[in-house]
């Protein structure tokens, strides 16, 4: 299989390190799809600047991940490369974090890896 036809999915792929990874994979000849969760304007600007399509869902939501993977594969082909890059922070010291903030961080940064990898596992 030619590298050009290989599909790479990058979570958190429209900003920061994720955007750099997405752009580098595209430059290396991969068909890249960038996932994002929140900032529609930033995702649109990224797509316009890079030519990389952006797809929206939260990696913290298992069902959204499973459905998102299905949509990506239906439109672009099988995902062969997954970069679990999505991550969030809640800028508070541990003793000042609320249980909700803690859960958001764990659901995205830890469970998100499972939520994205599981639907792609052969």
Regions found by a protein language model. Give the residues of each.
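The beta1-alpha1 cofactor-binding region of Rossmann-like NAD(H)/NADP(H)-dependent oxidoreductases
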Residues: 57-68, 99
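A short, exposed helix-loop element centered on a Lys and neighboring polar residues
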Residues: 117-118
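Substrate-binding pocket helix/loop in short-chain dehydrogenase/reductase
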Residues: 93-94, 101-106
């Amino acid at each position: 299989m030619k590298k050009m036809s290989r599909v790479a999915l990058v979570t958190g792929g429209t900003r920061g390190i994720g955007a750099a990874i997405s752009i580098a994979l595209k430059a290396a000849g991969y068909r890249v799809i960038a996932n994002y969760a929140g900032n529609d304007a930033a995702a649109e600007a990224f797509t316009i600047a890079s030519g990389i399509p952006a797809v929206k869902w939260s990696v913290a939501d298992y069902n959204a991940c499973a459905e998102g993977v299905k949509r990506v594969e239906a439109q672009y082909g099988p995902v062969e490369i997954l970069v679990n890059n999505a991550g969030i922070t809640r800028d508070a010291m541990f003793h000042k974090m609320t249980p909700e903030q803690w859960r958001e961080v764990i659901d995205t940064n830890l469970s998100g890896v499972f939520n994205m990898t599981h639907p792609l596992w052969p």
